[in-house]
Amino acid sequence: MKNLLSLLLLFTVINIFGQTPTPTQPIETSPTAISDVVSTKTISPVKKVPLDEALILIYDYDGTLFTFDLESETIAWTVKATDAYTEMCANKVTLIDGVLYVPFINGEIFAIDNQTGTIFWKSRIGNSTDQTVLKDQLPIIQEGKLFITAQNGNLYALNIKDGSLLWNYKLDSTNNDIPVLFFDNKVFTQSGSSFYSFEANTGKVLYQKSFEEPMSGKPVTDGENVFIANEKDVLFALNPNTPDVIWQFKLAENQHNVRERILCKDKKIYFAAQGPEASSIYALDSKTGTQLWKTDFKDDTIEYIIEESDNIWGYTRKAKLFQLDITNGEIAAETKLTTQPISNFEFPVDDSLFYYSDAALIQFDLKTKDENEVYLRTSIKDNAYSAYLKIIRP
């Protein structure tokens, strides 16, 4: 009996001191510790939807997504994220077969009927309610897959039919705020100082190339090679099949920060770089990296560029709207706006363009230079980060 009591006492002591103590308060998690898990809720099967071409989609800077009927001048439908710790858009929208694919900062991605706002499915990356999970993302959709990178260091491929996870890959950096490139059945993306190529179907890494500087530019292609700028002052041309650098172009002194201000057309690369004394738009031959022209904007900062009808359009931080001839870089038109754009440009069929300001949806008349308020917000928020527009059309 004495031996039995001694044995029981020994087991009790081991049990007490072998357990992990229960904390008296919740353990604080790292601000970057966002779960990699993807959860999905399918509401109805995705189907092809006719386009309601009277609508323009507005992803407002407070994170509200809605469509505005340009004919009746009324809001058609509104969708919001399930939850968000702050009011912010900070993302872009893709339209495929009448379905809108929308990322939200809380990690949610919705597939939405463009006509009614009905949600087909909801996916969520992680489960954070107090962090930005998706930032500056444009869903890239090809061959039934949606590709997107997140602030938890992952590249994801989702099935566009139901939002389910097909594959994901852990990248070098947790901060990923540049859309990926799909080209030749491959996915290209940057993360930290690395540039990756993936097999699109499986997520297999084809190559990972390291650079001396962080790679903060959006990857683009001319149909042959891939181009990406670093955070500092160099644009690289890369072979899409191997990590070989074909050529590199150094920006003018003290210029940097290309990011998403880059595009390709007709075997030429056009990009904008920022600097303390001037911003510049460059045109290069994509095969050789030879500079074709360069246009400077002194004492101002280029925020946005886009190609439309063989012109480079854009705006600056000082609310200057500009139009450049794509062949020689000459300024075809320049207007000092009374409202500061915070979105992309959308071009309807007439001689105008749409942009969003902190106060309204503006339709800018290219002939009269009038800024017409099409939709007016009921309130104005300070320090609006960004908004996004998309005319519903093929």
Language-model segments: residues:
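Bacterial Sec-dependent N-terminal signal peptides
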Residues: 1-21
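An edge-strand/N-cap motif at the start of beta-rich repeat modules
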Residues: 19-79
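Threonine-centered tandem repeat motifs in low-complexity domains
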Residues: 22-24, 135, 162, 242
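Repeat-blade elements of multi-bladed beta-propeller folds
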Residues: 39-64, 83-109, 123, 129-156, ...
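Short loop/turn segments that connect beta-strands within beta-propeller blades
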Residues: 70-73, 113-117, 159-163, 199-203, ...
